[in-house]
C-alpha cells in the first residue's frame, strides 16, 4: 500500500483536492486536516461538496488532482481495490441510509465484517458484536431484523457495525437527515459518547447546535470550496466570512437567538443534552 514518511501529527490531510464529474467541478482545491482524537464537522449548503469529501477520504471517489493522506497511507495513490479495502478496515463510514443487510439479523450484520474481512472466528466475532451493541444500547435487539427497527435504532446499529473493524477514524455522512425528529437525539448521543472517548470523527451534518457542541474544528463549504474554517467557537460565534454568517443566520434563525454577523459574537446557550430512547 502506498505510504509516505511524514512527521505530521494529523491523521487525515487533504491538499489541493480537485474532483470533477464531466464539466461539473465538485471540489475546487480542498485543504483539510484532522488531528488524531479530534471531532471535525463539515457544514454548508446542500450540494457544496461535503459528502464528496468523505468519499474521497475512503477512496470511494478518485480525484483528478491533489493528495489525500490517512495516517501514513496516500489514498490518492491506491490503484488496486484490495489496497482500498485495507484502508477501509481503518476508516469506518456511517451512511445516511443505514445500509444494513435486511436479510440478516442485527447480530449477523455486526459479525459479518470481522469474520470475512478480519478473519476472526465466529465465537470471538459474536462476543465483540454483542459488546458493541451494548455500547449503543441495542443489545436487546440482537436477534431482530433491520425492518423491525426504527430509523434511529437502525442508525445506532450502523454505528456499531462501523466499529467492528476497530477503525482509527469514523466518517458520518448526514446520519440524522433521514430520521424522524424524535429519534435524532438517540443517534447524536452515541456520536457524542464516541467523541468523548477520543474516537477521531469527521461529520457532515446539518445539526448546527450539535456541531458546535462537539467539534474541535469546523469547515464551512460552498460550491466546492472551503470558505472558512476554525474552532467551533470561532465559526459559530465569530465567523469572519459574511457567507458563513449568512448560512448560520438561516440555519439558526428560527431558534429565537440573535442572528450571527461576521465578526460579531453571539452565544448558543442552553444546548440540550439529547436523551437516548430504546
Where are these regions (language model features)?
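Intrinsically disordered, low-complexity regions
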Residues: 1, 14, 46, 62, ...
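Pre-NBD coupling/linker segments of ABC/ABC-like ATPases
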Residues: 1-6, 244
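ABC family nucleotide-binding domain
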Residues: 7-223, 227-232
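C-terminal boundary and immediately downstream tail of ABC-type ATPase nucleotide-binding domains
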Residues: 222, 233-277
Amino acid at each position: 500500500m502506498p505510504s509516505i514518511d511524514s512527521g505530521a501529527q494529523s491523521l487525515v490531510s487533504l491538499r489541493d483536492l480537485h474532483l470533477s464529474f464531466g464539466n461539473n467541478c465538485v471540489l475546487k482545491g480542498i485543504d483539510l486536516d484532522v488531528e488524531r482524537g479530534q471531532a471535525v464537522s463539515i457544514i454548508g449548503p446542500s450540494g457544496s461538496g461535503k459528502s464528496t469529501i468523505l468519499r474521497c477520504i475512503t477512496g470511494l471517489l478518485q480525484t483528478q488532482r491533489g493528495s489525500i493522506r490517512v495516517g501514513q497511507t496516500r489514498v490518492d495513490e491506491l490503484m488496486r481495490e484490495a489496497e482500498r479495502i485495507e484502508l477501509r478496515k481503518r476508516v469506518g463510514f456511517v451512511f445516511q441510509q443505514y445500509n444494513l443487510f435486511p436479510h440478516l439479523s442485527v447480530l449477523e450484520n455486526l459479525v459479518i465484517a470481522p469474520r470475512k474481512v478480519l478473519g476472526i472466528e465466529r465465537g470471538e466475532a459474536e462476543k465483540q458484536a454483542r459488546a458493541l451493541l451494548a455500547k449503543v444500547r441495542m443489545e436487546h435487539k440482537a436477534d431482530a431484523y433491520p425492518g423491525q427497527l426504527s430509523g434511529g435504532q437502525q442508525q445506532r446499529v450502523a454505528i456499531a457495525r462501523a466499529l467492528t473493524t476497530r477503525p482509527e477514524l469514523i466518517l458520518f455522512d448526514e446520519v440524522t437527515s433521514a430520521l424522524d425528529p424524535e429519534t435524532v437525539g438517540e443517534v447524536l448521543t452515541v456520536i457524542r459518547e464516541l467523541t468523548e472517548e477520543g474516537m477521531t470523527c469527521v461529520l457532515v451534518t446539518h445539526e448546527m447546535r450539535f456541531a458546535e457542541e462537539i467539534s474541535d474544528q469546523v469547515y464551512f463549504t460552498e460550491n466546492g470550496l472551503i470558505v472558512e474554517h476554525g474552532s467551533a467557537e470561532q465559526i459559530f460565534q465569530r465567523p469572519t466570512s459574511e457567507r458563513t454568517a449568512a448560512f448560520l443566520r438561516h440555519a439558526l434563525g428560527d431558534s429565537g437567538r440573535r442572528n450571527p454577523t461576521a465578526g460579531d459574537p453571539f452565544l448558543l446557550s442552553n444546548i440540550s443534552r439529547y436523551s437516548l430512547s430504546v
